[in-house]
Swiss-Prot record:
Protein name as it appears in the record: Probable alpha-L-glutamate ligase
Family: Belongs to the RimK family.
Binding site for Mn(2+) 1: 248, 260
InterPro entries, A to Z: ATP-grasp, ATP-grasp_RimK-type, ATP_grasp_subdomain_1, RimK, Rimk_N, Rp_bS6_RimK/Lys_biosynth_LsyX
NCBIfam families for this protein: PRK10446.1, rimK_fam
Cofactor comment: Binds 2 magnesium or manganese ions per subunit.
Residues that bind Mn(2+) 2: 260, 262
Record keywords, A-Z: ATP-binding, Ligase, Magnesium, Manganese, Metal-binding, Nucleotide-binding, Protein biosynthesis
GO-annotated cellular components: cytoplasm
Gene (name only): rimK
Native species: Stenotrophomonas maltophilia (strain R551-3)
Record domain ATP-grasp: where: 104-287
Length: 292
């Protein structure tokens, strides 16, 4: 199989591991910087060039598209899809996952539970919007933030109103959620490949913080996801159309709640914490996708 990995940095752990796993299973692999891919779109067909040369015959594309290049990266991926390449995470599915509000709407439509979420635009509606959310603490999230960035905890209603006013003054898109205190700064990252959770780890926020993301200083240990948690993770991935993703859950008094779905989950933290060869599981999965 001729496999392309869309990644801006060939030295990243996740990219290197996917290359190693693919080559170990006999596949031809090439790393492509999405920003060096450019395309021709016409009624007579689609074509892709990379650094001055045409890209043809690609069977499978594994996207490792960072949030900062979501629009261009998904356009490149879509072009490969239109040229007949397969992918575990289609361009439209990635776009769904990167828009937190849209993702939550799609999950809720499938009956998947999450922290209560509110969204509004007009400053005149702020007081009523917060009443729909319930008493503080509140969590404010930028709609397209990643790795724990753009997430704020407010302890008082006045602070929530102040943050809302400030973000609206910056024309930022954001949503607000209830704070789940019983989680105590911990969440569960379930790594979904195909129809199953292949590894899971508990991430714990550092002292004085509530964000458990590893990029925000959180720590991780292997953790067993319950059957219910695994089912929620797989259902969430399917709701967005993803077959390789990280689903972040919190354990609450009313059961597992979905926080976020990451369509480009890192491999380093989960492989180190769990001792699972996640990269090979991904390659085995895309082999099945390629079969007629």
């Amino acid at each position: 199989m001729k496999l392309a990995i869309l990644s801006r940095n060939s030295t990243l752990y996740s990219t290197r591991r996917l290359v190693e796993a693919a080559r170990a299973r006999g596949h031809t692999v090439r790393i492509l910087d999405p920003l060096r891919c450019y395309m021709r779109i016409a009624a007579d067909g689609f074509s892709m060039h990379y650094k001055g040369r045409p890209m043809t015959g690609v069977d499978m594309v594994i996207p490792r598209i960072g949030a900062s290049i979501t629009r261009y990266g998904t356009a490149v991926l879509r072009q490969f899809e239109l040229m007949g390449a397969r992918t575990p995470n289609p361009s439209d599915a990635i776009l769904r996952s990167r828009d937190k509000l849209r993702a939550h709407q799609l999950l809720a439509a499938k009956g998947i539970d999450m922290p209560v979420t509110v969204f509004g635009d007009n400053p005149d509606d702020t007081v009523d919007l917060l009443s729909m959310l319930g008493p503080p603490p509140h969590v404010v999230k930028l709609n397209e933030g990643t790795q724990g960035r753009g997430v704020i905890l407010t302890e008082k209603a006045s602070a929530s109103r102040g943050i809302v006013e400030a973000l609206r003054g910056l024309y930022a898109n954001f949503l607000m959620q209830e704070f789940i205190g019983e989680a105590k700064g911990a969440d569960l990252r379930c790594f979904v490949v195909g129809d199953q959770v292949v590894a899971s780890m508990q991430r714990q926020a550092p002292e004085g913080d509530f964000r458990s993301n590893l990029h925000a200083g959180g720590t991780a240990v292997a953790a067993k996801a319950s059957r219910a948690e695994q089912q929620v993770a797989v259902r969430s991935a399917k709701a967005l159309g993803l077959s390789v993703c990280g689903v972040d859950l919190i354990r609450s008094a009313r059961g597992p709640l979905v926080l976020e779905i990451n369509s480009t989950p890192g491999l380093e933290g989960i492989e180190a914490a769990c001792g699972v060869d996640v990269a090979t599981r991904i390659i085995e999965h895309v082999e099945k996708l390629r079969k007629p």
